Amino acid sequence: MFIRQFSEGEPFRCAGNEFVMLLPRDETGACEAVLQMVRPGGTTPPNSHETFMQIYLFWAGEARVYIGGEMQRVRAPAVAFVPPRTEHWVENVLADRELHYLYISVWPDGIPPEEREGGWKNVYAKIIDSYASRGYPVDAK
């Protein structure tokens, strides 16, 4: 059994937003759970994933969510599903509050070695570098 309080996760920043790693891929081999806080008026960079799907659980705030060519406004509490190989991004539409959601990434066939090489911190450092090359803010890794 694995139980962790949100306060026990490890915080990090990426593309101007704050995250807390709760359940790293290193410990599961098949999934990952991360809290994400999007600053007022902020967005996540557009991205997609070849080998995993994601579930977003919104619990505070309002967002515009783009998934696979469709945009929808979402008010917490709400849930969204992002299939593999589908471009997606999230925008906090509120100017005075953070958007809070939990995303759960699931690899149905297990996490490929190249997506866990060096541990989750190394994987996210590569993601941050990728976003920086596209002009998104560079944060501490």
PLM regions and their residue ranges:
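A short, N-terminal "cap"/entry segment at the start of jelly-roll beta-barrel domains
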Residues: 1-31, 116-141
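A generic "binding-loop/recognition-motif" signal
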Residues: 18, 40, 51, 70, ...
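Conserved short histidine dyad/triad with adjacent acidic residue
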Residues: 34-49
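A short hydrophobic beta-strand segment most commonly corresponding to one strand
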Residues: 35, 55, 81, 96-112
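Short beta-strand His + acidic residue motifs that chelate non-heme Fe in jelly-roll/DSBH
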Residues: 45-47, 65-66, 82, 88-95
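Glycine- and acidic-residue-biased ligand/ion/polar-headgroup-sensing regions
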Residues: 51-53, 58-63, 68
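Structural motif
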Residues: 62-64, 71, 87, 98
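Short acidic-glycine-tyrosine-enriched beta hairpin
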Residues: 69-84
